[in-house]
Structure formats: C-alpha cells, structure tokens
UniProtKB/Swiss-Prot annotation:
One of its GO terms (biological process) is translation. SUPFAM superfamilies: dsRNA-binding domain-like, Ribosomal protein S5 domain 2-like. The gene is rpsE. Residues 1-11 have a biased composition (Polar residues). It comes from Prochlorococcus marinus (strain MIT 9313). Coiled coil: none annotated. One of its GO terms (molecular function) is structural constituent of ribosome. Residues 18-28 have a biased composition (Low complexity). Gene3D superfamilies: 3.30.160.20, 3.30.230.10. Belongs to the universal ribosomal protein uS5 family. This is Small ribosomal subunit protein uS5.
Length: 209
C-alpha cells in the first residue's frame, strides 16, 4: 500500500512564505489605517474645541531679569481669551521669543476663565466694580444698541466675554494688565437676579420693586 507523499518541494516553500508576507503586510496596512483614522478624528475634535476660543494680544513688552552673568532678556505677552458666550480669561506668558510668550499667555488665560452671566440683550444684570492693585474699573449695564463703551484692555475683556451693550469706566491706574484683571474681578462678582434673590432670601418681585 503506497503512502501519500507529504514532503514539500523546494518550489512550494517560497510560495508559502510569500503568502504569509502578503497577509502580514495587509494586516499592517489595515492597522495603520485605523490608527491614522482615529488620529484624524482626534485632531478634528481638538481643532473644533480650539476654534471656539478667540485670543487677542493686549500688550507685548521686552523685559529683562538681572542674573549672575548679567541681564537676561525675554518677552512678556498679555493675552485675553474668550468664546464670546460668557467665558473669558486673562493670561500672561513669558518666553525668549514673541510666539512662545503669546502661546504661554493663551494657555494661562484658559486656566483662569470666568463665567459671566449675560442677559437676553447681551448685557450684564447689575452694576459691578472691580479692583486690582491701583486699578479700579466700574461697569454697568446698558440698553440694546448702546454697544461697548470702554477702551483699552477693558474693552477687549468685555468683547471676548460676549457683552454687546455695556458702559465701563477706568478709575486709577492706566496699566493694561491691572485694568484687564480689575475688569475680570468685576465680571466674576456678577450674579443673576435669581442668585441675588436666593442669597438675600427674598423673592424676585422684591428685587424688581
């Protein structure tokens, strides 16, 4: 009785090896597509989140620091970040170049965001006052169509917060950073009428009366 020949010929070995190599290459390509696809989706989500925010540079100054070897020069950037829907922040960044300072300022501003209660006319609910150092900023609500009556860094903060009708007055220091931070303090102290009534333990009718 003859036994079947199970020995592989020299011509069969390269063909089997080539088939395995093709399968491995296809698996690598498929995995690469999945990874690349996931990376693109993640990048798109990140870009959409970043597109919600606007940043404006208020001031860029060249500053120096005295060290053991002499003076070390760098740049300081004051940046205001906001989404024009009630969130705004002021950041400061220092770096050896302007681009690096602005990038750090944007990151610092996003770490110090303030939620601003907006009315249906894109104004603020009540009058507010804020101080920072020698700067004193007074902001008050305005009627629809008034616009943003403010100047300098205060105007930038109010616009990026999404406030369309407001009156602001600067009292004291003219320093852009102090004024921007004073405006942030004033916005952070704002409360809606419901929150004010709850804190005082009274009804909304008593507030309006």
């Amino acid at each position: 009785m003859t036994q079947p020949n199970t020995q592989t010929t020299p011509n069969d070995v390269p063909a089997a090896a080539e088939g395995q190599q093709e399968q491995q290459q296809q698996q690598r390509r498929g995995g690469g597509r999945e990874r690349r696809g996931g990376g693109r989706r993640g990048d798109r989500r990140g870009q959409e989140r970043d597109s919600e925010w606007q940043e404006r540079v208020v001031q860029i100054r060249r500053v120096s620091k005295t060290v053991k070897g002499g003076k070390k020069m760098s740049f300081r950037a004051i940046v205001v970040v906001g989404n024009e829907r009630g969130q705004v922040g002021v950041g400061v960044g220092k770096a050896g170049d302007v681009i690096g300072a602005v990038r750090k300022g944007v990151a610092d501003g996003k770490k110090h965001l303030v939620k601003v209660p907006l009315t249906r006319h894109n104004s603020i609910p009540t009058l507010s006052n804020g101080r920072d150092g020698a700067a004193n900023v007074l902001i008050r609500p305005a009627a629809p169509g008034t616009g943003v009556i403010a100047g300098g860094s205060i105007r930038t903060v109010l616009e990026l917060a999404g406030i369309k009708n407001v009156l602001a007055k600067r009292l004291g220091s003219k320093t852009p950073l102090n004024n921007a931070r004073a405006a942030m303090v004033a916005l952070a102290s704002l409360r809606t009428h419901k929150e004010t009534a709850k804190e005082r333990g009274i009804s909304l009718e008593q507030i309006y009366s």
